[in-house]
């Protein structure tokens, strides 16, 4: 193709994403668009086609963004090239959404005709507006008995501020309104800007590791053209590679002769090392480089931290390689090596939220076949010392000595909760119990209320979402943004077994709840830890001060069983001998700690119950994460 043909082709390209709250019909709409454009044959078609991960199908959620090319012949007789980028809906995967939107010019906003606007709907709209995208409202599920499209149309106009007079009324499940959506994409989504004759500038929005071809880059071509045989250069580190293949996804990878301005596809260049590429980098040609890199992505800071350890210590290097490969595919994952006296060598990992953490653990176990132990999650605290230094601490074991601490700041989030009016009282009570500060409350319509609180992230991390769902019978929707750090009365609580600190059981707690939580944990550990041949004291301590204690009584053999009567001094001698042996055993003995002990730090009440699947626990119906039953020896 010559330059003129490429420019005409560029005018026929439409790049768009589908954004929505969880379960509003994003993936189903994507399926119907694939069917309507005959991208996938009826034989290959299946529900959630773009959700290629087993985990996505099982949970019914989208975790990874997916890019796919479609051809659509519009009513004007012209054939258009659509690039559809499917996005996740959960708050933990906002980073995936932001990267998808940066590769688009338009976004289809899907809103459930029965449920209306929810918290994540707003969050995704703001992301789309930040990227200056053309937003096309679609009111989905109009065939539901509870559907009220007119109410939702007014909500879109009043709450978001979009003109919804031309919003498409659709049912992705029944295939209603799909053609109208496609025509609106042609008419309203602008063609990509960019110059095909300019030096190559391609934005890496995702990447994946292939055992045979190395790192495969998923790119949006902003300017220029790239084809097999070109020598490309990474603008962040200057490294060069020879392109072996370029192509598109349909959704299978299909090789092409070139990728030009406006295209979304993949580039394979025998990139062997994971560290050579990063999401948000700009690719250019080595012999005709662009003058400057594209504006990349804002790096997402992890909000939740947890330790990940291999059950078999010889799998440490395998775990490192697995995390590196996952990081390539999930740029928001961060990790660094750490050592625990109880758990050995592992990694301190940073996640965007609890679901993100759960998904990473399951991917490590499934895709890389590594059995893991995870510690309870924590957040990043700012510890100000008496030397006027500020230390960022995400691991309780790294907390400085209490005598050196001047004050501690913890992260607060702005929590936005949308809930029916009848549950407002329950939401406010829960938020205040979690140390939240009321900000404002707005009525979306006659029945639905938007409540905003400032809540410590540490309270959100544990069980806030589960308790919110149970107290509102599942009707609440919830979204949060990082707000600020505030000074709080926080203390580090250590758990001592037989007088020894167990670093993996330490946690940070507000001073007001320290005694209560310490007491709950020692009682739980008493039930979980098996009885030993000697008495084991379990203590909860803040610094040198013991705030709670419970003892596991020793297993005791009846040494008097053979004494049928006889002198009492003989019995006393046997009992004294047993007592001395127990004392000696206590001094040198070790305590077996089952893995459930680490979970007890997390679940502070008794509503944690087991389900039929082994080694898993549920909290109010929500799967937290898998814990292995390996027993650990605390010397």
From Swiss-Prot:
EC annotation from Swiss-Prot or TrEMBL: 3.6.5.n1
One Gene Ontology molecular-function label: GTP binding
Pfam families for the chain: EFG_C (PF00679), EFG_III (PF14492), GTP_EFTU (PF00009), GTP_EFTU_D2 (PF03144), LepA_C (PF06421)
tr-type G domain segment(s): 11-193
The entry's keywords: Cell membrane, GTP-binding, Hydrolase, Membrane, Nucleotide-binding, Protein biosynthesis
Domain of life: Bacteria
Catalytic activity: GTP + H2O = GDP + phosphate + H(+)
One GO cellular component term: plasma membrane
Signal peptide positions (record): none
SUPFAM superfamilies: EF-G C-terminal domain-like (SSF54980), P-loop containing nucleoside triphosphate hydrolases (SSF52540), Translation proteins (SSF50447)
Compartment annotation: Cell membrane
Chain sites annotated for binding GTP: 23-28, 140-143
Membrane topology: Peripheral membrane protein
UniProt entry tagged with the keyword Nucleotide-binding: yes
Gene Ontology biological-process annotations: positive regulation of translation
Similarity remark: Belongs to the TRAFAC class translation factor GTPase superfamily. Classic translation factor GTPase family. LepA subfamily.
HAMAP family in the cross-refs: LepA
Its biological purpose: Required for accurate and efficient protein synthesis under certain stress conditions. May act as a fidelity factor of the translation reaction, by catalyzing a one-codon backward translocation of tRNAs on improperly translocated ribosomes. Back-translocation proceeds from a post-translocation (POST) complex to a pre-translocation (PRE) complex, thus giving elongation factor G a second chance to translocate the tRNAs correctly. Binds to ribosomes in a GTP-dependent manner.
Name this polypeptide is given: Elongation factor 4
Organism of derivation: Streptococcus pyogenes serotype M12 (strain MGAS2096)
